[in-house]
């Protein structure tokens, strides 16, 4: 019986690159496909004896120079999607498999909440910054990697959804905190399964669809409404700085915390400033950026800022007050082939329309779930 890939120490990529060969060139020399070389280098499966011999002959080395049995531990190689924090020792990471690619995200890059609450899939033990590849020692069964559904977006309710999904399939849903524009870009690059977006088009008064067309082009996607929510100013209890309009954020005594460029919250603030003809340079803290609604609320609760744009639910969770500015639609954007074929997505979509989940979402405050699960047509 051939040993499983997780039992193999794989040095194929290292040897190929040492001979300055592309995957296609090595595949031609060994008489196999480029896709097979890619899969072997990612350690997705162990090579048959005949294939190992052909590769060794093509690279002019011994089979044991390419493949050997591990002494223990399950090592996998993948693409690094964000920066590894400085410091010594292994780095906690989430590992997912999307369309055959192994994608590695250090937990610190998923936001404070995910970093503290999510269990790591593995530990990054070796990296090559020149090619953005890392080796990860897995802390769980690699068979679970392809079952994960990665949702990029900024809705804190995705963490609640992941807990509901966990009842049906453990560790199935991976929320990755990122702004709407970043989520669409990640979806286009094939780095996530679902993008959560809330982007207003001022000229048409519509939500999300024009941005989807501009960002995704002809990519065939299904758009599913998650909820309508309220977005506005998160403020301290009692609103001591009397922040009620965007003009109040320009007061000399007020400090804001901002969201990153490309997020729906940042777009709302900039639209409000432009409408009131206020320069962003007048706002203390305009350049102080965080990457989620919950981080905005956390900064305000800690006294590091007086206000910031966020959703009512984030204010409620943090025990803060809220000044509404507008009602928005939050949509889930899903490539059609994922929508039709991935079992994990069916679990997610069934979960969000279930009565217990909707009741709890309503209890958070600021969500209107009456259209949850509704499919919205993308413009052609």
Roles of regions detected by a PLM:
Residues 226, 235-256:
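Flexible hinge/capping segments at coil-to-helix
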Residues 144-154, 247-266:
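Short loop->beta-strand "edge-of-pocket" segments that line small-molecule binding or catalytic clefts
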Residues 163, 181-195, 199-200, 289-304, ...:
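Short helices/loops that flank or line small-molecule/ion binding pockets
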Residues 2-7, 14, 22-25, 33-35, ...:
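N-terminal hydrophobic or amphipathic helices and topogenic motifs
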Residues 172-179, 280-292:
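Short beta-strand-to-loop elements that line the ligand-binding cleft
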């Amino acid at each position: 019986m051939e040993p499983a890939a997780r039992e193999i120490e794989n040095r194929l990529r290292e040897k190929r690159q040492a001979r300055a060969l592309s995957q296609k060139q090595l595949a031609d020399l060994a008489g196999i496909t480029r896709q097979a070389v890619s899969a072997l280098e990612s350690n997705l499966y162990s090579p048959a004896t005949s294939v190992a011999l052909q590769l060794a002959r093509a690279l002019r080395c011994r089979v044991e120079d390419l493949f050997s049995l591990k002494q223990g531990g399950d090592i996998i190689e993948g693409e690094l999607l964000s920066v590894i924090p400085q410091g010594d020792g292994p780095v906690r990471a989430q590992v997912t498999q999307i369309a055959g690619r192994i994608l590695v995200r250090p937990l610190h890059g998923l936001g404070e909440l995910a970093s503290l609450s999510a269990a790591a899939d593995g530990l990054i033990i070796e990296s090559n910054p020149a090619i953005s590849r890392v080796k990860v020692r897995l802390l769980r069964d690699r068979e679970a990697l392809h079952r994960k559904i990665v949702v990029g977006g900024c809705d804190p309710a995705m963490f609640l959804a992941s807990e509901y999904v966990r009842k049906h399939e453990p560790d199935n849903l991976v929320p990755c905190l990122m702004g709407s524009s970043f989520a669409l870009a990640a979806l286009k690059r094939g780095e996530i399964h679902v993008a959560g977006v809330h982007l207003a088009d001022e000229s048409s008064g519509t939500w999300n669809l024009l941005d989807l067309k501009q960002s995704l082009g002809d990519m065939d996607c299904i758009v599913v409404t998650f909820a309508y929510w309220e977005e506005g100013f998160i403020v301290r209890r009692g609103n001591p700085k009397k922040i009620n309009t965007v003009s109040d954020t320009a007061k000399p005594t007020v400090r804001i915390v901002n969201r990153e460029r490309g997020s729906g919250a940042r777009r709302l603030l900039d639209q409000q400033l432009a409408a009131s003809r206020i320069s962003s340079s007048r706002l203390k803290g305009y350049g102080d950026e965080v990457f989620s609604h919950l981080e905005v609320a956390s900064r305000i609760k800690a006294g590091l800022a007086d206000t910031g744009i966020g959703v009512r639910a984030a204010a409620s969770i943090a025990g803060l007050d809220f000044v509404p500015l507008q009602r928005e639609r939050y949509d889930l954007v899903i490539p059609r082939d994922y929508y039709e074929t991935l079992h994990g997505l069916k679990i997610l979509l069934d979960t969000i329309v279930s009565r217990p989940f909707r009741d709890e979402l309503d209890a958070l405050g600021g969500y209107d779930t009456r259209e949850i699960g509704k499919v919205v047509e993308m413009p052609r």
